[in-house]
Amino acid sequence: MALIELNNINFQYDDIPSLVDISLSIEKGESVGLEGDNGSGKSTLIKLLNGLIFASSGTYFFEGKEISKKTMKDELFEKQFHSKIGYVFQNSETQLFCGSVKEEIAFGPRQMGLAEDEIEIRCSDVMKLLGLTAIAERAPYHLSGGEKRKTALACVISMNPDVLIIDEPMNGLDKKSRVVLLDFLKAWKSARKTLIIATHEQSLLNELVDRIVTITEEHRIG
């Protein structure tokens, strides 16, 4: 059984097609790249995979369980699903709302009900991993674009998801931050954890993913 299974997915914004007849299987531990021109539907597909929007028609299964508007009304089911999929938005700023970097990173684990000592360990570990320790007490609105990006990623990986999905991972990063993030993504892939990235950077796809899925201008898989 595939970890992720999309069958004949269609999605429209105000009757304008954004995804057309999308069928896609992703195995546990696979690294998949999504490519396509602006407006092709990459970001829409990522939002659908994260359960933020739902198909107009077709089915989406995660670990053999259907993800739909109906099933996600179950609060326990929704919480379990979102704990397994980590999503870093293209605009990381929209994910940051706490008073400090450390508070941001601790927010997700607290929502999961983890003990404070475990939360402290997770925060410390991910801040060291991504080079955020020195700015732990800094407010997000005082961060550079690269620092915001790394903080958003830290928030996601502090929850130890099974799947990591990133929209334009290198967006807004300086050279040093790109190296840190690339090293992390390589380590994630080497650990055989599922990775899905959407990007225009062909070199990044070549370096990180097992296969590339192209979304065409017709909003289909090419």
Task: Outline where the language-model segments fall.
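Catalytic Walker B motif of ABC-type/P-loop ATPase nucleotide-binding domains
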Residues: 164-167
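Helix-to-loop junction immediately C-terminal to a conserved catalytic motif
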Residues: 50
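H-loop/switch region of ABC-family ATPase nucleotide-binding domains
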Residues: 199-200
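Conserved ABC ATPase "signature" region
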Residues: 117-135
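Conserved ABC transporter NBD signature motif
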Residues: 58-70, 81
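The feature captures the beta-strand-to-loop junction immediately N-terminal to the Walker
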Residues: 35-37
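Conserved ABC ATPase signature
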Residues: 139-143, 147
